[in-house]
């Protein structure tokens, strides 16, 4: 069986049965006009694709930063409260889990759950890790790095999520 593989630049919209946001995390938040009529963009040009109106950090996608002095993870969890979130460090990984039971929203009843796992750099000071949730729903997990390549120590422990009253200062990409 021959399968044709196309470069993404030459991909055309596949019609209303294959919406372009199939794997995005906007479940239960309504649709944009181009979600309902994706074939219109391909009639203009096969290479044209409308951009999303939301920023990367507003779409549930995380941002990981690691520089000389610290390691930081930004994650949009606006649908979860601190009580719904669990943050654990196991060995070289941080695991962030969020779950809330079924509740009513504007569109009916909904329940949400996610699980993210990130590898920590070996020189992160695991005893000084912190996690906070801003007023606009941005989870910030951070920890300082140790100097001169010292190993940060490995153990399993839970990191409490504290609530901040101000919106996040995370830059939108």
Swiss-Prot record:
* Entry keyword annotation includes Nucleus: yes
Read off the InterPro entries from this record.
A-crystallin/Hsp20_dom, Alpha-crystallin/HSP_16, Alpha-crystallin/sHSP_animal, Alpha-crystallin_N, HSP20-like_chaperone
The UniProt entry, under Gene3D superfamilies, shows: 2.60.40.790
Its GO biological process annotations read: lens development in camera-type eye; negative regulation of apoptotic process; protein refolding; response to heat
Residue positions of the PTM Deamidated asparagine? 101, 123
Q: Which GO terms describe its molecular function?
A: metal ion binding; structural constituent of eye lens; unfolded protein binding
Modification N-acetylmethionine occurs at: 1
Residues with Phosphoserine modification:
45, 122
The residue ranges flagged as biased composition, category Basic and acidic residues, are: 153-167
**Region feature Disordered, mapped onto this chain:** 144-173
Query: Residue ranges of the sHSP domain?
Result: 52-162
PTM N6-acetyllysine: at which residues?
Answer: 70, 99
Record PTM text: Acetylation at Lys-70 may increase chaperone activity. Undergoes age-dependent proteolytical cleavage at the C-terminus.
Q: Which residues carry this modification: Deamidated glutamine?
A: 6, 50, 90, 147
Q: Name one Pfam family in it.
A: Crystallin
Q: Under what name is this protein listed?
A: Alpha-crystallin A chain
Specify the species: Artibeus jamaicensis (Jamaican fruit-eating bat)
- Taxonomic lineage: Eukaryota, Metazoa, Chordata, Craniata, Vertebrata
């Amino acid at each position: 069986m021959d399968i044709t593989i196309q470069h993404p630049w030459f991909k055309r919209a596949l019609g209303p049965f294959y919406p372009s946001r199939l794997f995005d995390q906007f479940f239960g938040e309504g649709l944009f006009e181009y979600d309902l009529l994706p074939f219109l963009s391909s009639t203009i040009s096969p290479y044209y694709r409308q951009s999303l109106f939301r920023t990367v950090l507003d779409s549930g996608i995380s941002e990981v930063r690691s520089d000389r002095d610290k390691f930081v993870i930004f994650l949009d969890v606006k649908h979860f409260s601190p009580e719904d979130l669990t943050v654990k460090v196991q060995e070289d990984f941080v695991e962030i889990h969020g779950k809330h039971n079924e509740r009513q929203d504007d569109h009916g009843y909904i329940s949400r759950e996610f699980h993210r796992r990130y590898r920590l750099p070996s020189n992160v000071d695991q005893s000084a890790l912190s996690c906070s949730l801003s007023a606009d729903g941005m989870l910030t997990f951070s920890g300082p790095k140790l100097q001169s390549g010292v190993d940060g120590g490995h153990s399993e422990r839970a990191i409490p999520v504290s609530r901040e009253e101000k919106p996040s200062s995370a830059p939108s990409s």
